[in-house]
Swiss-Prot record:
Assigned GO CC terms: chromatin; PcG protein complex; transcription regulator complex
Species this protein is from: Pongo abelii (Sumatran orangutan)
Coiled coil ranges: none
Gene: ZNF571
Record family assignment: Belongs to the krueppel C2H2-type zinc-finger protein family.
Official protein name in the record: Zinc finger protein 571
C-alpha cells in the first residue's frame, strides 16, 4: 500500500514576518515548543526510519530516504522555528536531488542544497550545518541532563522509558508513541508544565495553554455567520451553531429528551441515576455539577464576587449579576408569545408560560397540591413540617422563606424601595409594585374559567373562584352567604352600623380601611389614577377603569331581560329595577318610593 503524503505544514501555524516580529521571546519559545510537540506527534506514526514521497515535478520521480535520524529532523525544525517557518533552508551538504518545500516539511524531509559542499555526504548522513548551541533550557527529570531543544529531550526521555515498558503495559491505556505516552503520563501524575504568565493557571498540554491565553487577549477567531457571536475554540462554535439549526444529536434513552451538547446529555443522565458526586463538606448537601457545589460553598463563606457597578450590590453567581443589571437598563429580552409580557431571564419566562399552559410540575406528596415553581413547593412543605427557619431579630416573628423575612424587616425600617414611575407610590416588594402597575395599564392577566372575569392579582382570582363553589359563611340577620369570614364580618357592620375607620380630618367613618384611604385623598387632593387618553385623574382605580370605557366604548354589563348594555355595574343594577319594579328608596314625608337615590333627593326638595 503506498504511503499517504502528509506535510508538516498541515499541522503547522504560520506567522508573517510582521507578526513574528511582534512576538516577545517568551511567546516565540512557546511557539517553538508547540511546533515541536506537533512534529513529535507526526513522527510517531511509524515513519521514523524510512518513508517515501513524490518529488513535486512533472516527471513525478520517486525519491527514497532511509534512516533519517529523528534528532536531525528536530534540529531542522528548530532551525525553521528560529528564523520563521516557511523560509528557504540552506546546508553545506552535497544532497543533490532533494529540495526544501516552502509549502512545508514533508515527513520524509526533502532538502535542497543551494551551495555545493566541498565534502561528500550520503543521504543518510547528518546535516553538516547545525544550529548554534544555545542555553540548555530543557532538563531531564530522570538524570537532570540538559538539552538545547525540546526535541532532543523528548528523544532522550524515550531511552529512559524503554526500561519502564513492562510497567506501562499494566495500564488500561497503553501508548506506543512518545508524545501520546507523555500526555497520558501527565494525566496520571497531575503534572502541568505549561503555566500561564497572566494568571498562573497550569496545563498538561501546550495547546491547552494557547487556547487559555485567548481569554486574556480576548481573541475569538471563530465567528458565527448567523449571529456574529465569536468563540475561542472551533468546537465551541460548532456547538453554538446547533442553536440556529435546532440540532440536538444527544438523546436520552430513558425519557427521549434531546440535547445540543454532549455535556448537557451527561449531566441530564444524573437526574435518572440520582448521582450527585459533588458533596459539600460543611453541610453534606450533594450536587450534580461541580459548579453548583462551588456556588453553594459561597453561602457558607459569604463570598459574593460579582458586584454591580451601578449600586454596589454583590452576587454569588455571575448570571445573577447579569439579570440584576437589566433592572438598571430596563432590558427584558425574554418575551412571552402568548401575552407579550417580557422578563429579565429565561427561567422567569418558563415559569410564566406555565400560567398559560396550566402546568404545575411540582407536586406535594403530603396533600397533592401542585406548584409552578420548585421553590414554591419547598416553601409549601414547611407548612406541613412547621419549619420557619428565618426569624426577625426585631420582633421575633419567623418566616418560611428568607425573602419573606427581608420584606417583613422593611416594616420596621420603613423602607419602600420599589417606586411607581406613574404616580410615585412606593412599595415594600417588587411584586406589590408589579400588581399596582396593572392599575395604570389596565392589565388583568388572571381570568376566571367559569365566568371570564379577570383580575389584577392571582389572590383575587382565588377568592373569586370560591363564589362558584360553596358559601360557608351566612349572615343570621338577612341570610346572605359569603365565601370568606372577613366578608361576613364587613357585611355585619351594615346591620350593626359599626364604622371603625374614622377620618381625622372630618370625622367621617367607614366600614372598610380601603374606604378611609380613598376618602383621605379628597383632603389631600391626591388623584393617582390618571387617564393616558385625556389626562383626567381619579381617586380610585375602579373609577379610572370605568372612565376608560368611555374611550373604548366597552359596555360589559348587559341586561338579560332586554339586552341593553352598560359601562358600569351600578348602572345595570339601577336599570334592572325597571324590570323588577323594585323601589328601595322611600320618602319619609309622604311614603313615595323611588328606584334611585337621586330621585328621592329631588323629591324631598318639593317638601322643603
Amino acid at each position: 500500500m503506498p504511503h499517504l503524503l502528509v506535510t508538516f505544514r498541515d499541522v503547522a501555524i504560520d506567522f508573517t514576518q510582521e507578526e513574528w516580529e511582534c512576538l516577545d521571546p517568551a511567546q516565540r519559545d512557546l511557539y517553538r515548543d508547540v511546533m515541536l510537540e506537533n512534529y513529535s506527534n507526526l513522527i510517531s506514526l511509524d515513519l521514523e526510519s524510512s518513508c517515501a514521497t513524490k518529488k513535486l515535478s512533472p516527471e513525478k520521480e520517486i525519491y527514497e530516504m532511509e534512516s533519517l535520524q529523528w534528532e536531525n529532523i528536530g534540529n531542522l525544525i528548530n532551525h525553521h522555528l528560529q528564523y520563521g517557518l516557511g523560509d528557504n533552508m540552506e546546508c553545506k551538504g552535497n544532497l543533490e536531488g532533494q529540495e526544501a518545500s516552502q509549502e512545508g516539511l514533508y515527513m520524509c524531509v526533502k532538502i535542497t542544497c543551494e551551495e555545493k559542499a566541498t565534502e561528500s555526504h550520503s543521504t543518510s548522513s547528518t546535516f553538516h550545518r547545525m544550529i548554534p548551541t544555545k542555553e540548555k533550557l530543557y532538563k531531564c527529570k530522570e538524570c537532570r541532563q540538559g538539552f538545547s531543544y525540546l526535541s532532543c529531550l523528548i528523544q532522550h526521555e524515550k531511552n529512559h522509558n524503554i526500561e519502564k515498558c513492562s510497567e506501562v503495559k499494566k495500564h488500561r491505556n497503553t501508548f506506543s508513541k512518545k508524545p501520546s505516552y507523555i500526555q497520558h503520563q501527565r494525566i496520571q501524575t497531575g503534572e502541568k508544565p505549561y503555566e500561564c504568565m497572566e494568571c498562573g493557571k497550569a496545563f498538561g498540554r501546550s495547546s491547552d495553554l494557547i487556547q487559555h491565553q485567548k481569554i486574556h487577549t480576548n481573541e475569538k477567531p471563530y465567528q458565527c455567520n448567523a449571529c456574529g457571536k465569536a468563540f475561542i475554540r472551533g468546537s465551541q462554535l460548532t456547538e453554538h451553531q446547533r442553536v440556529h439549526t435546532g440540532e440536538k444529536p444527544y438523546e436520552c434513552k430513558k425519557c427521549g429528551k434531546a440535547f445540543s451538547y454532549c455535556s448537557q446529555y451527561t449531566l441530564h443522565q444524573r437526574i435518572h441515576s440520582g448521582e450527585k458526586p459533588y458533596e459539600c463538606k460543611d453541610c453534606g448537601k450533594a450536587f450534580i455539577l461541580g459548579s453548583q457545589l462551588t456556588y453553594h460553598q459561597r453561602i457558607h463563606s459569604g463570598e459574593k464576587p460579582y458586584e454591580c457597578k451601578e449600586c454596589g450590590k454583590a452576587f454569588i453567581l455571575g448570571s445573577h449579576l447579569t439579570y440584576h443589571q437589566r433592572v438598571h437598563t430596563g432590558e427584558k429580552p425574554y418575551i412571552c408569545k402568548e401575552c407579550g409580557k417580557a422578563f429579565l431571564c429565561a427561567s422567569q419566562l418558563n415559569e410564566h408560560q406555565r400560567i398559560h399552559t396550566g402546568e404545575k410540575p411540582y407536586e406535594c406528596k403530603e396533600c397533592g397540591k401542585a406548584f409552578f415553581r420548585g421553590s414554591q413547593l419547598t416553601y409549601h412543605l414547611r407548612v406541613h413540617s412547621g419549619e420557619r427557619p428565618y426569624k426577625c431579630k426585631e420582633c421575633g416573628k419567623a418566616f418560611i422563606s428568607n425573602s419573606n423575612l427581608i420584606q417583613h424587616q422593611r416594616i420596621h425600617t420603613g423602607e419602600k424601595p420599589y417606586k411607581c414611575k406613574e404616580c410615585g407610590k412606593a412599595f415594600i416588594c417588587g411584586k406589590q409594585l408589579s400588581e399596582h402597575q396593572r392599575i395604570h395599564t389596565g392589565e388583568k392577566p388572571f381570568e376566571c374559567k367559569e365566568c371570564g372575569k379577570a383580575f389584577i392579582r392571582v389572590a383575587y382570582l382565588t377568592q373569586h373562584e370560591k363564589i362558584h363553589g360553596e358559601k360557608h359563611y351566612e349572615c343570621k340577620e338577612c341570610g346572605k352567604t359569603f365565601v370568606r369570614a372577613t366578608q361576613l364580618t364587613y357585611h355585619q357592620r351594615i346591620h350593626t352600623g359599626e364604622k371603625p375607620y374614622k377620618c381625622k380630618e372630618c370625622d367621617k367613618a367607614f366600614i372598610y380601611g380601603s374606604q378611609l384611604s380613598e376618602h383621605q385623598r379628597i383632603h389631600k387632593g391626591e388623584k393617582p389614577y390618571e387617564c393616558k387618553q385625556c389626562g383626567k385623574a381619579f381617586i380610585r382605580g375602579s373609577h379610572l377603569t370605568e372612565h376608560l370605557r368611555t374611550h373604548t366604548g366597552e359596555k360589559p354589563y348587559e341586561c338579560k331581560e332586554c339586552g341593553k348594555a352598560f359601562s358600569r355595574g351600578s348602572e345595570l343594577t339601577l336599570h334592572q329595577r325597571i324590570h323588577t319594579g323594585e323601589k328601595p328608596y322611600t320618602c319619609v314625608q309622604c311614603g313615595k318610593d323611588f328606584r334611585r337615590p337621586s330621585q328621592l333627593t329631588q323629591h324631598t326638595r318639593l317638601h322643603n
